[in-house]
């Protein structure tokens, strides 16, 4: 325990992070809880951004389990407005060149980031399109913000984007409840995630910082809007470290936590399996360095995507086993789930740029220490 505490304190003392909260758990319970820095603790609420995506995938899986949706349901058959999206093929004289997609995206495409929809932070062409058209940004909370063009045809490559925001709209259309009510009733309440939701008490919200050119952190704010037109299922949740660890432990326990079953074992297996249909994760190249660095968590390793999670297909020496699941939020919240070794963890800060080298080293050091001290040998 002390070694993990020391690693967190060193990361803050070295100015890698302004503060950090970390927790480790197994199917049986919580193994470790620690924090460093003065900005946060276990009760602090974080902007978890893309931690939201796994929750959104689970919401869709609940409907799949109930026979109301399938992995290969075409999005346009549920949301006709999705049929208006076109593929961006470059620019001609400063004008975007658009065409109809060759195939229609499915629910599986949305959950695996193979729908063709990509964020402007990691796609220079989409960033250029947004700049020249004054397209509303994702954090406006406007439904129109989701109507980005596709960067490629569905099913042709992995590209990180707003697919799960669209998946949230699919859930709403199929179920009839707004996505916040659906998640509250079907996920958060049964799992005892009492501090997780789309709205936040400002008194509990962590501060946030961005690293300047001088290497120092300065206050900054990046957050979803309150009471938006649409809640972004891919980015708009707030949560705490203990709450999110409960969600991860439910996955370790194959759909049940504290006697409350929220997914069938078979559904959890589908969520964990490679759903990329032969495609592979591609290194994320930053188009906005102020906000994010390039991101490739396991260079040289075959990496796929399950129904909601990034998945490494080989053991990472000294770290997670093959078949582990994980992802992150843009303000440097990170998590992983290792079903083979029965461990899950969260490592949560509130800083930019995302995935800068010193942050990723601190996270890797923490993960290695967890496996060295808590995890049974393979």
Report residues per predicted region.
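Alpha-helix C-terminal capping/helix-coil junction sites
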Residues: 12, 64-65, 146, 252
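Short, conserved catalytic-motif segment at the N-terminal edge
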Residues: 1-49, 68-70, 84-92, 96, ...
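Generic C-terminus detector
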Residues: 351-378
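Glycine-rich phosphate/pyrophosphate-binding beta-alpha loops
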Residues: 229-237, 324-336, 350-355
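Short, surface-exposed loop or secondary-structure junction motifs
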Residues: 29-30, 77-322
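Hydrophobic (often cysteine-bearing) scaffold residues that line and stabilize catalytic clefts
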Residues: 4, 48-52, 56, 163, ...
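Active-site SXXK
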Residues: 5-9, 22, 28, 47-75, ...
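Short, well-ordered beta-strand elements
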Residues: 31-34, 335-336, 342-351
